[in-house]
Amino acid sequence: MQWASVLLLAGLCSLSQGQYDEDSHWWIQYLRNQQSTYYDPYDPYPYEPSEPYPYGVEEGPAYAYGAPPPPEPRDCPQECDCPPNFPTAMYCDNRNLKYLPFVPSRMKYVYFQNNQISAIQEGVFDNATGLLWVALHGNQITSDKVGRKVFSKLRHLERLYLDHNNLTRMPGPLPRSLRELHLDHNQISRVPNNALEGLENLTALYLHHNEIQEVGSSMRGLRSLILLDLSYNHLRRVPDGLPSALEQLYLEHNNVYTVPDSYFRGSPKLLYVRLSHNSLTNNGLATNTFNSSSLLELDLSYNQLQKIPPVNTNLENLYLQGNRINEFSISSFCTVVDVMNFSKLQVLRLDGNEIKRSAMPVDAPLCLRLANLIEI
């Protein structure tokens, strides 16, 4: 009997110790489960999401102890998802929607991409004027079915995605708060001078893959613009008055045949310029057109140039392949060639021209001493 009491007491101690060990690690299981359901509110929009819903990708209980996660609020449209752990986002993408559903007032991020929406009716966002991001790309929206003031009331809107639609005109008016505007892959033919009026906070403008023939002076007031993409259009002239803050300019695959003298002087921060696949000739370029000290990369490939245009010694990458260049002028890179004066050029592409490697002048290695790739 005495031994039985001892064994019973030992068993109880062992059971108590085992329960204590399990409970002492409950917080680890809690953190693991919390991490599995975590969703980053500042990365709510992968442009090409690999999963239809980036939240809740791991299955399993959300909590090791306590109540389950709260259900979706009742104000969420039945066609959409409103994750409880990110209450200001509404996901209505890839649902074959033909209309825009009601948007609750608490929403900051709404995603309607990849549907069959053809209209943005007036007042559809009046209940949610605090929206920051609106994604409407990959739909069938036409300009005549976009309410004129549908976006102007969104005074906090920062990003607007209207690319890959059927727009033929610039939307507007747009709110001053806008920072990114995506209008690429539409059928827009022109940008009126007042189309972007008041967008002083805009930093990136995507208008590539449209049918734009002219933009006039519509870019003049965009004092914060850093990136301008007008590639794959029908432009014959470069935009008038580039913004002073501009760093990246993409104009490839147009019909541009001339660039004015000192055109880039008003943009002292400009780093990258792409003008490939245009109709540029030496007659359409002034002597100092590309002599900008800020430029790091210049792409003039696949034009109709016969001579290498003069560039600044600070330029690092120059692409001239696919032209009609028939001579190698070292003065295009170095006005004076000596030990102290040389070009910072690292990449020079001259292949696909009418020039041979033997045409390189003897002082080329001294001028282009930093080059690690010269293709002829």
UniProtKB/Swiss-Prot annotation:
Q: Which residues are glycosylated?
A: N127, N166, N201, N291, N341
User: Where, by tissue, is this protein expressed?
Assistant: Highest levels observed in knee epiphysis, in calvarial and diaphyseal bone, in nasal and costal cartilage, in the eye, and in bladder. In mature knee joint it is mostly present in the proliferating zone of growth plate. It is also observed in ligaments, especially at insertion sites, in the junction between meniscus and joint capsule, in the perimysium of skeletal muscle and in the periosteum.
* Chief location category: secreted
GO CC annotation, single: extracellular region
Q: How is it modified after translation?
A: Binds keratan sulfate chains. Sulfated on tyrosine residue(s).
Instruction: List the SUPFAM superfamilies hit by this protein, alphabetically.
Output: L domain-like
Q: Which residues form the LRRNT domain?
A: 67-105
Q: Where in the cell is it found?
A: Secreted, Extracellular space, Extracellular matrix
Pyrrolidone carboxylic acid PTM positions: Q19
Renumbered ranges of LRR repeats: 106-127, 130-151, 156-176, 177-198, 201-222, 224-245, 246-266, 269-289, 294-315, 316-335, 344-367
Cystine bridges: which residues?
C334-C367
Where does the secretion signal sit in this chain?
1-18
**Post-translational modification Sulfotyrosine, affected residues:** Y20, Y38, Y53, Y55, Y63, Y65
Superkingdom classification of source: Eukaryota
Keywords for the protein's UniProt record, in alphabetical order? Disulfide bond, Extracellular matrix, Glycoprotein, Leucine-rich repeat, Proteoglycan, Pyrrolidone carboxylic acid, Repeat, Secreted, Signal, Sulfation
Which SMART domains does this chain map to? LRR_BAC, LRR_TYP, LRRNT
The family database entries (InterPro entries) matched by this protein are listed as: Leu-rich_rpt, Leu-rich_rpt_typical-subtyp, LRR_dom_sf, LRRNT, SLRP
Assembly, in brief, is: Binds to type I and type II collagen.
- Give the function comment from the record: Affects the rate of fibrils formation. May have a primary role in collagen fibrillogenesis.
Family to which this protein belongs: Belongs to the small leucine-rich proteoglycan (SLRP) family. SLRP class II subfamily.
Name this protein carries in UniProt: Fibromodulin
The organism named in the record is Mus musculus (Mouse)
Gene this protein is translated from: Fmod
